[in-house]
């Protein structure tokens, strides 16, 4: 059973799990501590003798503007320490997998030739997964390198000739010859594979690594400090090796500065050549060069350019100058290109650790990069960032440290990335770079063309840091300029009316003599884009009836001298004046659902309101006229209300009166008798006034006391004789009526005719069946059944049982 299961495994994992697998088909690497001893396996660089010339050094001085193109960000060179503790289970698991998949490192002979090293460079299985990728990219790299270097050197030659004065002809010829030799050497040595020094860590001697890395910038005032003057502690062979490398880097600097303006920043440079010269930085305590030497090298670019050609060994052209030259060139391109690398916000830069040294490595592409690595480090140098990002963007392999393979890192660069949207990183220079075959190729090409044209314009005008105005700003400036010109032209004519200045914005009778006011009107006219406005007239006509045309008054009305429509009446004293909103009978209808008369489709016809009579009571009940009373007919203003008392009471009477009910002619089942009866309440004759006596006045008078007492007694008698009717009201309220209470209440409290008519016609209305009536009858019937059948018997049994117990 177990054998059947193992057959389904992939061939790669099965081979890795077997003991006899020796890694012959895999030239992988690992960043374990076992690779620390590979520092001594670096081959000896060849040397070519080139005659030194002091005259050339004295006469040649590069343009200071070119020297300042060097990246200032390279001063902040400090690499994060790669020795991190593994705190995550996932990290340790993936590290073990990386160790299992890593083959044993092959020994490389120090005395081996570059051709031998090139043969051992890419040993990948011809039937493996990565065979197709390696073969295709190997051919593409060789072709692209040849074309790129040739175009770069030709541009370099043209630029050198244009920028050098006639007085410096000798220095121009020397620099041009150096550039041509570099180009020929690079084309010849192309098959040779250079060990990726930028990804290795030299554990043997820290001071040697530091001297090589900073040899191109260690300068005293107008003097180059060679590598021999540094306190080197290693072997003599290694000192000689690194001294040659430093001289080669210095030599390539002149060509890099001269071709900065001519080479297209979008040119693809394979990472195998572009990023080979870089030495990982060690701790700050082991630095052999001070920060002062770094600043000196930036402040004296002339000395660097002049003495490079003096100390440049002849043997350094065949191998290393092209790589370092392209690497520095690419780092300078990042300063002026806004869209060089899309992967600055997409992928993450591999941290250059100490333990990732291996002379022979498996070529990796963007599809075969299976290792994790740390995200961008704020301490890493800008030049290393540019190199690493370019390697990823151009589809080349990048050496990543297994120590940086962390799941806990917020920024990752691997095929196992969960999402690319969570990486919110922007390069310190704002550079973006994408592949030429990617989705964003067309957009990036357009951006680069615009950026190149802008940069060329700025260089011609000798203006630094000046950006072109946006389209909106330019349009605004042009509009403002036109407005100011037009306003100044208009202000020169003081006799012009405001109508001539701004058509339709002001009356023609007003003269605009103020200049600023003209400008304001002109501005409004110029920038008015004609905003959309709703057709309020048509919108209103669809819902509300239009008012009467004064020119065509309705029949029976005429227009008076004030422009108001009034009725035509011979009797001028009784004229009823109405305002202009008076409508005829047909126009006074409220059309709640307007219908188009032109279309005689019966299906589109809607409900139309009947003729509406507007008076004091109905005007507030008509819809849509409450909020828009202007279209309603006007009410009369001079009508005299006549209060004529009549004995007749109409059906719409709203005054409460005591009237008799008119019972229908037929038999009535009601018990009430609606015959007129006399009022049973005794009428109390009330005196008109209540007896009154001013006691204060009486007591304060000068009359005799006998007269005062007599008046008081008379007042007392008058009060006794005064009857307020309270006793009669109390007796009527407390008396017992011979009739039933219902009849008594009905007779005493009936107030109007419609109440009595309702009671009289109740028997007829009760015969009409309705849902509510049926429900009420059923409920009443159920109640009768329940109480008659059950409750009555139970109540009898209850009382009988209680009586028995008693």
Swiss-Prot record:
Originating species: Kluyveromyces lactis (strain ATCC 8585 / CBS 2359 / DSM 70799 / NBRC 1267 / NRRL Y-1140 / WM37)
Name of this protein: Protein FYV8
Residue stretches of biased makeup (Polar residues): 38-63, 71-85, 315-329, 458-500
Family named by the database record: Belongs to the FYV8 family.
Region entry Disordered, spans: 1-88, 101-124, 248-389, 409-517
Biased composition (Acidic residues): 418-432
Function according to Swiss-Prot or TrEMBL: Involved in the resistance to unfolded protein response (UPR)-inducing agents.
Compositionally biased intervals (Basic and acidic residues): 280-312
InterPro entries membership: Fyv8
């Amino acid at each position: 059973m177990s054998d059947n299961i193992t057959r389904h495994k992939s061939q790669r994992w099965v081979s890795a799990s077997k003991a006899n697998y020796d890694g012959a088909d895999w030239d992988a690497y690992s960043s374990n501590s076992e690779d620390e001893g590979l520092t001594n396996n670096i081959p000896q660089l060849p040397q070519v003798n080139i005659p030194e010339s002091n005259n050339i050094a004295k006469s040649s001085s590069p343009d200071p503007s070119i020297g300042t193109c060097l990246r200032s960000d390279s001063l902040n060179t400090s690499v994060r320490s790669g020795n991190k503790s593994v705190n995550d289970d996932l990290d340790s698991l993936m590290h073990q997998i990386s160790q299992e998949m890593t083959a044993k490192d092959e020994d490389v002979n120090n005395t081996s030739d570059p051709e031998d090293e090139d043969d051992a460079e890419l040993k990948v299985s011809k039937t493996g997964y990565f065979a197709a990728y390696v073969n295709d990219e190997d051919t593409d790299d060789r072709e692209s390198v040849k074309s790129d270097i040739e175009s770069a050197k030709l541009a370099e030659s043209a630029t050198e000739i244009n920028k050098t004065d006639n007085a410096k002809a000798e220095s121009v010829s020397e620099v041009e010859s150096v550039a041509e030799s570099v180009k020929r050497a690079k084309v010849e040595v192309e098959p040779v594979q250079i060990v990726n020094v930028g990804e290795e860590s030299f554990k043997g001697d820290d001071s040697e690594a530091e001297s090589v890395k900073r040899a191109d910038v260690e300068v005293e005032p107008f003097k180059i400090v060679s590598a021999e003057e540094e306190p080197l502690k290693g072997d003599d062979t290694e000192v000689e090796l690194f001294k040659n490398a430093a001289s080669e880097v210095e030599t390539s600097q002149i060509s890099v500065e001269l071709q900065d303006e001519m080479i297209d920043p979008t040119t693809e440079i394979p990472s195998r050549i572009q990023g080979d010269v870089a030495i990982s930085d060690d701790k700050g305590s082991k630095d052999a060069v001070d920060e002062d030497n770094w600043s000196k090298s930036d402040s004296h670019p002339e000395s660097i350019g002049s003495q490079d050609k003096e100390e440049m060994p002849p043997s350094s052209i065949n191998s290393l100058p092209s790589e370092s030259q392209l690497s520095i060139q690419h780092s300078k391109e990042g300063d002026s290109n806004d869209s060089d690398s899309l992967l600055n916000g997409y992928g993450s830069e591999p941290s250059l650790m100490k333990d990732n040294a291996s002379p022979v490595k498996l070529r990796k592409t963007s599809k075969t990069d299976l290792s994790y690595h740390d995200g961008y480090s704020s301490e890493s140098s800008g030049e290393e960032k540019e190199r690493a990002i370019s390697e990823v963007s151009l589809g080349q392999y990048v050496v990543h440290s297994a120590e940086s393979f962390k799941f806990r890192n917020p920024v990752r660069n691997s095929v196992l990335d969960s999402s690319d949207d969570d990486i919110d990183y922007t390069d310190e220079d704002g550079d973006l770079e994408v592949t030429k075959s990617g989705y964003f190729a067309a957009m990036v090409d357009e951006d680069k063309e615009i950026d190149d044209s802008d940069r060329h314009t700025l260089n011609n005008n000798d203006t630094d840091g000046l950006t072109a105005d946006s389209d909106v700003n330019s349009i605004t400036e042009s509009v403002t300029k036109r407005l100011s010109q037009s306003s100044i032209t208009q202000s020169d004519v003081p006799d012009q009316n405001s109508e001539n200045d701004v058509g339709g914005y002001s009356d023609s009778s007003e003269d605009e003599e103020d200049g600023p006011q003209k400008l304001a009107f002109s501005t409004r006219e110029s920038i008015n884009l004609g905003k959309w406005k709703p057709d309020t007239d048509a919108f209103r006509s669809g819902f509300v009836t239009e008012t009467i045309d004064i020119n065509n008054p309705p029949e029976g009305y005429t227009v008076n001298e004030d422009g108001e429509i009034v009725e035509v009446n011979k009797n001028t004293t009784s004229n009823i004046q109405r305002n202009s909103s008076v409508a005829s009978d047909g126009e006074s209808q409220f059309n709640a659902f307007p219908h188009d008369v032109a279309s005689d489709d019966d299906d589109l016809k809607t409900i139309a309101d009947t003729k509406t009579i507007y008076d004091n009571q109905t005007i507030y009940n008509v819809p849509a006229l409450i909020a828009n009373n202007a279209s309603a007919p006007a009410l009369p203003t001079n009508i005299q209300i006549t209060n004529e008392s009549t004995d007749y009471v109409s059906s719409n009477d709203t005054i409460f009166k005591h009237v008799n009910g008119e019972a229908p002619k037929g038999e009535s089942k009601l018990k009430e008798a609606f015959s007129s009866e006399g009022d049973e309440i005794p009428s109390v004759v009330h005196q008109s006034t209540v007896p009154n006596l001013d006691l204060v006045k009486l007591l304060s008078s000068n009359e005799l006391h006998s007269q005062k007492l007599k008046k008081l007694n008379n007042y007392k008698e008058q009060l006794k004789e005064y009857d307020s009717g309270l006793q009669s009201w109390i007796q009527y309220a407390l008396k017992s009526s011979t009739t039933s209470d219902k009849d008594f209440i009905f007779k005493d409290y009936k107030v109007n005719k419609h109440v009595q008519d309702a009671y009289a016609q109740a028997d007829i209305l009760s015969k009409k069946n309705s849902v509510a009536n049926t429900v009420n009858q059923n409920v009443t019937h159920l109640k009768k059944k329940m109480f008659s059948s059950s409750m009555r018997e139970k109540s009898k049994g209850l009382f009988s049982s209680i009586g028995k117990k008693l």
